[in-house]
Structure formats: structure tokens, C-alpha cells
Amino acid sequence: DVEYKAVVVDEPGQKGKVIITERLTFDIHAASKNNLFWELWRELPEQYVDGVKVDYKVNSVKQIYPDGRVYVYEESPKLYWNDSDYVKENTKYGPGKWFHSEGPYNPDQRRYECVLFYVDGLYREEVVYEIEYEMYNAGLRFGDCSELYLSMYSGDTIKYLDSYKAQILVPNDDMPAKGNYLVQTYGTSKNDFPYKESADANPGYHTFSFELDKWDLRFNPYNEYIEFVLLSYGEDAFSFTEHASVNDYYYDDSLDYIHRDMNEY
């Protein structure tokens, strides 16, 4: 299960940033008591969009216990990989620590962008984590419009999701006016999914939200992802991208092309 919240931050030097908080529930079923889980992970969709790289910065990882207790994980100084790391006498790298593997993506070298949680040998149990990370270049600016593009979940593990709940919060000062924006969702076997809007769910923000259950979370091989796009134009073309990075199409009028691609999808 995933509970996702993204907050748009359009401030100097922030490069189209959103701050993301996720609560992840893992239902662990190890093959045997002699073959336990020693690490869990959350893939971070890794890609270049219009010439700029979607970057991540991990701020914190916490384990949430059923009684409400919170255990704050420390950052591990290196990738916890060799068999010699997995011994009780050496806790420098884990368990109880996390590591941000930055990639770049290379399956031949077993290299992916993800957050790894080093755990103490799990067999059959349910564990909950809360992670906070920053995603850069989610806000893209063009000559006559802007796009908030959130690649929220993808990869092989998407087929194991039981539920996915999300909120996207845009500060009121950065939210385009009605008639100056549209929203498109992407993914699942239906190709898109419904969402809701609220002006008062989170004070100070305009909120987009959606909830997907096991029935919704069915995918074809060509659309194993969950994505959200907010497109602004007209008088509010740059309402949430004043401080966005310069991309390959920063100075080019792109609204018609984006509309065409949305319609074709």
C-alpha cells in the first residue's frame, strides 16, 4: 500500500521542486526462515524529461509501529551489498539504516535509483515506513505553458500494489485560475483514472487527489505506471514554474503539441 503526498515548491533555486511524503506498507512473505528479507526498497522513477534530469534528494526514513511509536532510520554510509555486511557484529551499514542509490540505471550492473531500507531479517510480517524526499524538475516551463509532471510509481513492483492514495498540493498563490489549466492522469489498464479537486482540503493549497484499489491497480505491459500531469496556460502559463530549470523547449511554444499528445493518448 502507498499513501503519497506531493507539495509544489516554486522558489528561487528549487528547480521545479516538489516535496514528497510517502507512507509505504510492506506485507513481507519470505520463502523460509532461512531466507529472510534484509532489505526493502522504493524505486524512484529515473528519467530525463525534455533534456533535464529528474533528480531526487532523500530527507528522512522512519519506521512506524502499530502502537504509534516512530523509529528514525539513519543514513548508511555506503551501499549495503556484500555478504560480510550482513552480520550482527557489524552494524555500521545496517540494519536500521537507509541508503539512497542514485543510479544511473543499469540492470546489468544491478544499479537502480531507489531508497533502500536495511532491516533485521524479516520473515512473515507487515511493516510501515514513512519517507520524505525531494523531486527536482517536476515543474517544466515552455514558451506558452507549463507542466507539472509527476511520475509517481513504476517498475516491476507496481503489480503487487493493493492500494494507492495520493494528494498533490499546489499553493494557492501558484495555482492557475479555472479555465487556465487542465489535468491528465496516465496508467493502469484503463489508461487513466479519475481524480478529485478541493480548494479547502488543505488550507493554503489547492488539492488534487485520487484513490486506487486492487481492482483499479491492474496494468498492461505497456502502461505499468501511475502518472499525474497539471498543465497551465493563458494568463497563468507560468504560475508554478517561475523558478523552473531551462529545458530543451523552455523558449518554444508547446501547448498545441502537448494538447495533441494528450488527445492521442
Where do the PLM segments sit?
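Lumenal/extracellular ectodomains and adaptor appendage modules
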Residues: 1-265
